[in-house]
Amino acid sequence: MKRAKKAKKEKKESTPLPFPYLASIVLLPWWISLSFKKCFEPWVTHWCNTRQSKFFLNDIQEKGTLERFIELEELFLLDKIIKEYYPDTHIQRLWIRIHKETIQLVKIHNEDHNHIIFCLSTNIISFTILSGYSILGNEELFILNSWVQEFLYNLSDTIKAFSILLFTDLCIGFHSPHGWELMIGSIYKIFGFAHNDQVISGFVSTFPVFLDTFFKYLIFRHLNRVSPSLVVIYDSINEELI
């Protein structure tokens, strides 16, 4: 029995940490997504510019475009007001400016259209690659998991308690709502959803509370079973910070 444990330990120690596998998980989806964007960006841009579409891709583009058209309409009304007091050359320059603004508005609309298409495509590619890694790289994931568990096990109880408090305060603590708002806003922008302040505010005000309670329960249950001394250190540090 002892020989088996010793052989298993020696095998674990002799197994190298899969740094290439870890680097490929992080860099390969990004590299493939970037290559996809560079290769297909001219084709998608040409397709979007030549395609006559009667509908907007999403509510965000529609809202932004309507705001710009309102600005152009205000310029047109201003033109009617001041044309009696200024010469025709000034009116002509104003019309040229309105024409340029309209062209620029169409370009911005097409760029937003292309951006959302590329974001959706790259997200799908990244998800597919990571899913393939999780299915095909079981052995590498097992080795990586064993190294992470060993690293966490070798940490002192004080460092573990401090890390838990730091993680919970950043993700679900008092200052976390600002981070949640930025993250949800970025997700909305990437996937082309309409920005809804009421939904974001309701989510930020409720979800971190439930998540905080759930995490504290899991942490207390796990630490109380694994290391009761760590629970004492965690409570003492938490009381001092509060």
UniProtKB/Swiss-Prot annotation:
One of its GO terms (cellular component) is chloroplast inner membrane. One of its GO terms (molecular function) is proton transmembrane transporter activity. Its main location: plastid. InterPro entries: CemA. One of its GO terms (biological process) is potassium ion transport. The keyword Transmembrane helix applies. The chain crosses the membrane at residues 116-136, 200-220. It is a multi-pass membrane protein. It is found in: Plastid, Chloroplast inner membrane. It comes from the Eukaryota. It catalyses: K(+)(in) + H(+)(out) = K(+)(out) + H(+)(in). Pfam families: CemA. Keywords: Antiport, Chloroplast, Hydrogen ion transport, Ion transport, Membrane, Plastid, Plastid inner membrane, Potassium, Potassium transport, Transmembrane, Transmembrane helix, Transport. Belongs to the CemA family. Contributes to K(+)/H(+) antiport activity by supporting proton efflux to control proton extrusion and homeostasis in chloroplasts in a light-dependent manner to modulate photosynthesis. Prevents excessive induction of non-photochemical quenching (NPQ) under continuous-light conditions. Indirectly promotes efficient inorganic carbon uptake into chloroplasts. This is Potassium/proton antiporter CemA.
